[in-house]
Amino acid sequence: MSGTAEENTREVEAGVVTDFTREMSYGEYLHLDELLAAQHPLSTPEHHDELLFIVQHQTSELWLKLVLHELRSAMRAIAADDLKTALKNIARVKHIQRTLTEQWSVLATLTPTEYAQFRGFLANSSGFQSQQYRAVEFALGNKNAKMLDVFAHDGPGHAQLTELLEAPSLYDEFLRHLARRGHDVPAELLERDVTKAHVHTPALVATFRVIYEDAQRYWTEYEACEELVDLEENFQLWRFRHLKTVERTIGFKRGTGGSSGVGFLARALDLTFFPELYAVRTEIGS
């Protein structure tokens, strides 16, 4: 028995606003005209799958913008000894990380044959040049002043990275917070050159062991430690999915930005933000 079109149509309620001559619309609030006009495939003739490649990376950049927003808030909160706010920020970052990691499954639908037909139009542009990705790494403590050279052409981007390079990282702020709470944090870490990457410090492992083995007493610190481990693990999962997506798409070709490609990405898996939080696991209960 067939129905009617009216039965399968939702009526617009009387209270729904339809006149936007004097009101701000959804599209205006989000600046959708500019956002949806920002995809400019360069392949000639235009290749169908280049739009996928562009949208994948543009949406990633939007999520990275939000990650930075939340990490900056978390660092300010920790500096003010407001760990509850910081943990809320970090929880949101973790959800964004999972979204970013899952997005690789969309790009993985791009076959090697399809990508090869427009890859040459990328010239030397590469995700390695993502200023926001580098900013996230700096905020988490993986700092390298040489990376600034890549952004010499980008005044505002270079300035933001310089600011993050010279500021304490999320981990630096957390260790300072622990010291203010009376935990035994080595002075060398509290006074270190924050423009350098954090180096594994065995003496700090003992401090974390105290927290982990008396979690009820130090519950807030314990919870924060586990949140940081989640943060790093999610980041490593993103790196791994990136590597495997690149491998299945271009094999072991060199990257468009001049890197060795998969080999270069694989070495990033050895980098760590919070090494003592992993090292302490060997010590607990022993």
UniProtKB/Swiss-Prot annotation:
The protein's required cofactors: heme
Enzyme nomenclature, EC number: 1.13.11.11
Textual note on the cofactor: Binds 1 heme group per subunit.
Signal peptide: none
Pathway the protein acts in: Amino-acid degradation; L-tryptophan degradation via kynurenine pathway; L-kynurenine from L-tryptophan: step 1/2
Gene Ontology BP annotations: L-tryptophan catabolic process to acetyl-CoA; L-tryptophan catabolic process to kynurenine
EC class: oxidoreductase
Catalytic activity: L-tryptophan + O2 = N-formyl-L-kynurenine
Binding residues for substrate: 53-57, 115, 119, 256
One Pfam family hit: Trp_dioxygenase
Gene3D superfamilies named among the record's database cross-references: 1.20.58.480
A GO molecular-function descriptor: metal ion binding
Keyword field: Dioxygenase, Heme, Iron, Metal-binding, Oxidoreductase, Tryptophan catabolism
Chain residues that bind heme: 242
Stated family: Belongs to the tryptophan 2,3-dioxygenase family.
NCBIfam families per record: trp_2_3_diox
General function of this protein: Heme-dependent dioxygenase that catalyzes the oxidative cleavage of the L-tryptophan (L-Trp) pyrrole ring and converts L-tryptophan to N-formyl-L-kynurenine. Catalyzes the oxidative cleavage of the indole moiety.
Subunit structure and binding partners: Homotetramer.
Listed name of the protein: Tryptophan 2,3-dioxygenase
